[in-house]
Amino acid sequence: MAKFRILVFYGSYRSDRMGIRLANFIVERLGRRGCDVELIDAKAVNLPMLDRMYKEYPRGEAPQVLEQVASKIRDADGFIFVVGEYNWGVQPGLKNLTDHFLEEWFWRPAAIASYSAGRLSGVRSATAWHGTLCEMGMVVVSSTISVGPIGQTLSVEGESIGANGEALEKAFPRFADDLMWWVEAAKVQHQRKPPPY
């Protein structure tokens, strides 16, 4: 099987970030499947609040960090967005990073993994992200992962714990299989016929 390049995006800027556990879990599990996977941490990238999108800079004049992230997005075969929920909404850090780009996202599949400290598992944020990612030109797969309470599901090291962790381990293969099917289909189609725009 071909090795697919998958970017995992995570967006909390908080000091005591819990969602990084889920991001690390996903990166590790995709690595076991032979994927070339990289975590893109919005806090580490540290983009300013959106003023100009990457595409609005003259060619070669965008800040280096935008050039680097744009290149990684263009080279990826698929994406996973690890999303937390803030007051029924999306995390501003991840949304800010995502909004800096547009055409770079086009014609690739994406999956959503949500989490929260509570029992609702960030599902309201996942619902909001679904429409956003579709509008940005991605095909969002139907399988999702929803983790909550995250502190009772994953250890600090990102290992599954307890009954919630067992449920996550059981759900992950279908989630990954769904994304990988679409990743492979999109890659074949890209080779067969260039995207129309």
Where are these regions (language model features)?
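N-terminal beta1-alpha1-beta2 submodule of the flavodoxin-like/Rossmannoid cofactor-binding fold
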Residues: 1-96, 103, 160-197
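Short, solvent-exposed amphipathic alpha-helical segments in soluble enzyme
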Residues: 24-25, 98, 128-131
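Short clusters of hydrophobic/aromatic residues that line enzyme substrate/ligand-binding pockets
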Residues: 47-50, 147, 154
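Short, electropositive alpha-helical surface patch
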Residues: 94-100, 136-139
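His-Asp phosphorelay/catalytic-motif detector in bacterial-type signaling
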Residues: 106-108
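Short, glycine-/small-residue-rich phosphate/pyrophosphate-handling segment
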Residues: 110-152, 167-170
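Amphipathic alpha-helix from the class-I
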Residues: 152-159
